[in-house]
Amino acid sequence: MTGRLTPERLVYEVISAGDPHISPDGRQIVYSLGQSDRDADRGTAQLWLYDLDGGETRQLTWTGQRNREPRWSPDGRFIAFVSDRVQGCSALCVLPTRAPGEARELTRHRQAIGHLDWAPDGKTIAYTTAFDPDDPDEQPPREGQAPKVRVTRRLDYKQDNRGWLNDTRTQVWTVDVASGERRMLTREPDDLWYPRWSPDGRWLAARVSTDNGLYSRLALVDVATGVTRRVGPESGSVTVWSWSPDGERILFAGDTEPTAGVDLFLYSLSSDSIRRLTTDLPCAPDGGFPTVLPPSQPVWLDDSAVLFHAIRAGESGLYVFNVDTADLRREHAAQSLNIGFSIDQSRRYVAQAHSSFDSLGEVTLYDRHTGERRLITRNNASLLQDAPPAGWERFEVERDGTSIDAWLLKPADFDAGRRYPVVLDVHGGPHGFHGYAFNPMQQSLASHGFLVVFANPRGSGSYGREFARMVLCDWGGEDYLDLMAVLDAVLERPYADPNRAGIWGYSYGGYMTAWAIGQTDRFKAAVCGAPCFDLESMYGTSDIAHAWGQLQWGGKPHEASEAFAAHSPSTFAHRATTPTLIVQGEADERCPIGQGEQMFVALKQAGCEVEFARYPGGAHAMLRVGPPSHRADFLRRLVGWFTDHLG
């Protein structure tokens, strides 16, 4: 072994290819290539183009620090993208692909532009950007002027990674490609995301979200008038959707009520009706992550078959669903966790961003005719050759009649004759999931001599509705026992040291870490990231808990006060003895900084060794989108805490 995957290397040497889109003729793939700029302390991204015929790659953009969201025009002659090349603004640009030429700016906004979609005739592009009715002209704040007093009358007045919103909401706009003339199409009181054109260009189907994305419906926008019609119940959800070839139907994934599950539905425009197609979909269509990753939209193969990207048991797969027969077939799966989904007009080639235990930040191409999948980039091959990733194995644990999937990462130079410290990594959610992905936290720990075990206890996503619902009103119950059973199975192995066990998790994983150290003294060290520590205070301060908490915890605080207390780590923190590091972003609106502050005080007064690392400006998603220096600092603290306390 010649090198380690240190925090610095994982942050500053990793190059990530993302958001790949294949040209309509299937001959080229455009993607955004990103990396961390140490001096500027920010991520940068430029557009690159891969030629399938010759295998050559070339850089397309050079101006600006972040060029993203590349989207092909229907005829393949242009690529639209979003750029920060105009200081203080977000610009929508188009770049010619078949002849040399400069990118041309179509329009700009002070707020971020996103969710581009070309009209079928290639003359117009739909997009979204935030609109503040109190600042319709998007005027910058005056220098030296005191911040305005913030007054709100709505519950969803803030959102993680966006901050204070009040009445600011994302709206749908269109811009004429030839003239650059733009038009604000919607003025809705709620956010509209990811508009998709109907085949005849008369409608845009978008996701309209309420309560910061907890509930969502389809919004049908009449392009001529801007009139918006909402489809489905207010308390339902929509994750992905796609127009049928005739423009008469829309397939969508989601649910008609808050159940923690996802099914497939078919909406008919002519009858304005919804038909349920499945009752417990065994896989989870890739709906992205709010404000961070877009959904992987399905594609109709013909009048009845739909191809989509979904996750099953932590593994990416391509699935074909027949809307007439309700037959579901997995066409392809690999031991990876991919992001995005782009297909050519012939429906042969699928391009995705790729991550696995052995690679990260690459673009993968799947040939539906041959069944072959291959990486077309090798951005991080030299890094992983010098600093090999962890070895791994998958195993299962049976507990109380339920099978729990689990994985174990081992140092690349693993020696079965040695004894290693063990760290249990708990995912977020609670309906998140672990899977076949390259995880910087896990890989950094394994590279520094730790066994890392992680699992999908009951409540995890990607196993269907019933499995996900097992955690409702039972946080810290059966899910905790599942995790302890998985850890027990690993600690029975001769190379795992039961006297050197640690636990770490972020978000719901932070909840479980805080919960565990109040239930047992088996852990000799803990790292608790962005915890949910006290359910009652979380309910009134989180951007989503006032609605989401009712489903998860059994009601409002006054309706379920005993349950809130029984499932709060704060109730048991006085019993904790585990040395604990708490890490949290100070601008976290999902699990607010007050949760970490309460935990710090409770552990300090319990006599624990405790340290609190706070990241100014850090949102809940800071480990993904935060400044490189903060992400590197976090990884150093994670590895350092366990090294100091587990040896």
Where are the regions that the model predicts?
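Residue-level detector of Asp-centered blade-edge/turn motifs that repeat once per structural unit
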Residues: P24-D25, P74-D75, P120-D121, P199-D200, ...
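Active-site-proximal cap/loop segments of hydrolase catalytic domains
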Residues: P457-G647
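Cap/lid segment of the alpha/beta-hydrolase catalytic domain
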Residues: T377-N499, W504-Y506, M538-A547
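Surface-exposed loop and turn segments in beta-propeller and other repeat-based domains
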Residues: R183, R275-P294, N379-A390
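Non-catalytic accessory segments flanking enzyme active sites
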Residues: D19-H21, A126-T128, D135, V149-T152, ...
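A flexible loop/linker signature enriched in serine peptidases of the S9 family
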Residues: L33-Q46, T61-N67, A80-C93, E102, ...
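Hydrophobic beta-strand positions that form the internal "hydrophobic ladder"
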Residues: I29, G76-I79, I125-A126, G201-L204, ...
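Short loop/turn segments that connect beta-strands within beta-propeller blades
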Residues: D51-G55, P96-P100, D176-G180, D222-G226, ...
